[in-house]
Each structure stands twice: as C-alpha cells, then as structure tokens.
Amino acid sequence: TRTDHPSGSDRVFEAIETIDPDRRFTQILNLQGDLPDLSPEIPHLLGATLDRGETDLATLVTPASAEEAARPQVVKAVVSWQDADFGTALYFSRAAIPTGTTALFHHIGVYGWRRDALARFVALPPSPLEQAEKLEQLRALEAGMTIAIGKIDTAPGGIDTAEDLEAARMRAAAAHHKD
C-alpha cells in the first residue's frame, strides 16, 4: 500500500479495493500489527459486535487499570453501555476520561468495518479531533458514524514504546522455548 495514508483504516481500504475489486466482502476486520498477542477469539468477537446492531464500525474495549489510565499511549473510550458487554462509543481520548467514579475503558485498536462505511470514512479528510488526539476513530465520530463497542476481559499486549517491544520479544522467546 501507499505510505502516505493518514490512518491504518485508509490503508486497509486501499488493500481491500485491490484484493476484492468485485466487492464480494461487505465486512472488513482491521487487526493491528502492534498487537502481537491478539487471541483468536478477538476477530470473532469483533465480527459479532459489528453484526449486533445498526452500526458503521465496531471496536473493542477492556476495563483500564489505574496505571493504564495514566498512560497517554493507552487510548481510553467513553461508552454508552446498552448491556454489560455491548455499547456505543461516545468519545476516545489519550486523557483519563471520563473523570469521577465512572470506570475507565482501555480501547483495543482493532476495527470491524462495514465496507460502505469504510468507503465513506476514507473519503473524509482527517478531522480536527482526529488530528488533535491522533486517533483515527474520531474522524468517524465527527462525521456522525456509529461505533459499536464490545467488551473483553483483558487487553492483548500492545507495542507502543521501546519497553513494550522488549516485553513482547521476551514473551515470544518464552513461548518459543515452551514448544
């Protein structure tokens, strides 16, 4: 794909248009390379969240620890919950929001897109909030798109810093030596 895309979702759209010009696939899952510990259940839950309601795209969250809440590399999601495991996104931020006694949720950077919604998304320029927070999903929210949220128990290990990369290498080496 081109190297000048403003977001991963823009890159995914280019890839799916190249791979599937006949548009056989109507849903696209965008799984991030910086989440090497993604469990096999994640794509299934992401697809189920996308299928659950009238929504443009879906993503996942998990309860945030106090340490995660304080880290700007951990994106927090504000969610309007419809039940214990399903809701709609209201906002995403690198800040610890919402304040108060409400539980904080760690956004997992995976997306399930309806193909038509992804096409609408990539036709939009990066939005002011997207540029301020450096979070692509804010472009969708600012455009009035609906983001369904599924809840998982724990976050997969992500790589946001050099320390995260070293920890991932150690996990991979330990797993390799088990085999």
Regions found by a protein language model. Name each.
Residues 1-31, 37-45:
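Short phosphate-binding loop-to-helix
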Residues 1-7, 72-74, 169:
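One-carbon transfer enzymes
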Residues 4-9, 66-67, 156-158:
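A short acidic, often aromatic-flanked loop/helix-cap motif at beta-alpha or helix-coil junctions
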Residues 17-21, 51, 173:
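Residue-level signal for alpha-helix termini/capping positions
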Residues 23-25, 52-56, 145:
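Short, high-confidence coil segments that cap the C-terminus of an alpha-helix
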Residues 30-32, 60-61:
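Short beta-strand segments
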Residues 38-127:
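Conserved core of the sugar-phosphate nucleotidyltransferase
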Residues 102-179:
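Conserved alpha/beta core of the MobA/IspD/sugar-nucleotide pyrophosphorylase nucleotidyltransferase superfamily
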